[in-house]
């Protein structure tokens, strides 16, 4: 299955005078179209040229044709775990804005997942939403296999599925709660990357982004389970980057500070205000500020960056 996207041409359009000017050019648009392969064998029709014709100041009356798209390249595809809400949904939207095809998994938020799928599909990209528990090795692998079948091999993988516990002292953390945090935040990362890695290695390229937290870097009081699991994510990232670097695969980690998402819903308004005041930039971060870091690490601009932890945290650590 072949997918294509187009790069906007750099040629400048002729300057158009103020529309109130009686001598302003009268412009007629003529569009030529190109038929391109689309999802499941269907074709998309996209413009490749605009022709301006008209008379007035700055225009000779002759036709002016400008290419909208200069080259055709393979459309990029990203797989995202935990993509239906919060930071995961912001990541999906950020990639969609850049024209990437997207497969994302979700667990409980079925309504939000389908709403996001419809929203992103309206941009003309291919979007797949799959219900899968990252903590289940069979479901994690099934998500990757389904995504490959529908969209082809991934160019990037973003592991953003994660859970946290309400703040409490370690002696009040149950065995089940401890195991659940690690099963999603650490085991789920392992299961997902293990399933996807052969597709990256086979093509000898790709980017993997994991999701830690500032608590994984500095630790958080009454957040021992979460902090420990996110510290493990950082170690996983650094080790894997060394392992797959010779295959031209980059692995990096994003470790956000306090971000305005549902995961922090257990914090009181006073707690959030206190955290904002402790942040040098004086505010809480947004999911899209994290998402832009993730997308950058998957872009060509980061092609010599691997094994690193990027911390969008407002300077808090």
Language model: regions and residue ranges:
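Substrate-binding pocket helix/loop in short-chain dehydrogenase/reductase
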Residues: 168-170, 174-182, 271, 275
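Alpha-helical segment proximal to the catalytic Tyr-Lys
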Residues: 198, 242-246, 303
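C-terminal helical subdomain
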Residues: 253, 275-305, 312-314
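Conserved glycine-rich cofactor-binding loop
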Residues: 84-85
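Active-site helix of classical SDR
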Residues: 193, 229, 237
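Residue(s) in the substrate-gating loop at a strand-loop-helix junction
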Residues: 213
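Conserved glycine-rich Rossmann-like NAD(P)H-binding loop of the short-chain dehydrogenase/reductase
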Residues: 98-115
């Amino acid at each position: 299955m072949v997918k294509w996207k187009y790069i906007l041409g750099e040629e400048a359009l002729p300057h158009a005078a103020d529309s109130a000017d009686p001598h302003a050019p009268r412009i007629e648009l003529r569009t030529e179209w190109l038929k391109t392969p689309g999802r499941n064998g269907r074709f998309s029709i996209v413009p490749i040229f605009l022709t301006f014709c008209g008379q007035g100041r700055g225009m000779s009356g002759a036709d002016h044709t400008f290419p909208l798209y200069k080259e055709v390249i393979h459309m990029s595809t990203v797989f995202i775990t935990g993509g239906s809400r919060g930071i995961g949904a912001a990541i999906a939207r950020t990639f969609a804005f850049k024209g990437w095809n997207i497969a994302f998994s979700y667990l409980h938020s079925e309504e939000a997942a389908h709403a996001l799928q419809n929203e992103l599909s309206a941009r003309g990209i291919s979007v797949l939403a799959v219900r899968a528990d990252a903590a289940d090795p069979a479901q994690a692998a099934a998500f990757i296999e389904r995504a490959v079948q529908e969209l082809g091999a991934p160019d990037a993988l973003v592991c953003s599925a994660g859970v946290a516990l309400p703040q409490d002292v370690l002696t009040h953390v149950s065995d089940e709660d401890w195991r659940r945090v690690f099963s999603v935040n650490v085991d789920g990362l392992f299961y997902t990357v293990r399933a996807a890695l052969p597709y990256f290695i086979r093509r000898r390229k790709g980017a993997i982004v994991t999701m830690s937290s500032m608590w994984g870097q500095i630790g958080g009081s009454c957040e021992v389970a979460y902090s420990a699991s996110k510290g493990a994510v950082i170690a996983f990232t650094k080790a894997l980057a060394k392992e797959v670097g010779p295959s031209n695969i980059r692995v990096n980690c994003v470790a956000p500070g306090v971000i305005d998402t549902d995961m922090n819903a257990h914090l009181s308004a006073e707690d959030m205000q206190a955290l904002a005041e402790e942040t040098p930039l004086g505010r809480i971060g947004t999911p899209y500020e994290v998402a832009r870091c993730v997308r950058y690490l998957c872009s060509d601009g980061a092609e010599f960056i691997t094994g690193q932890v990027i911390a969008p945290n407002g300077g808090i650590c």
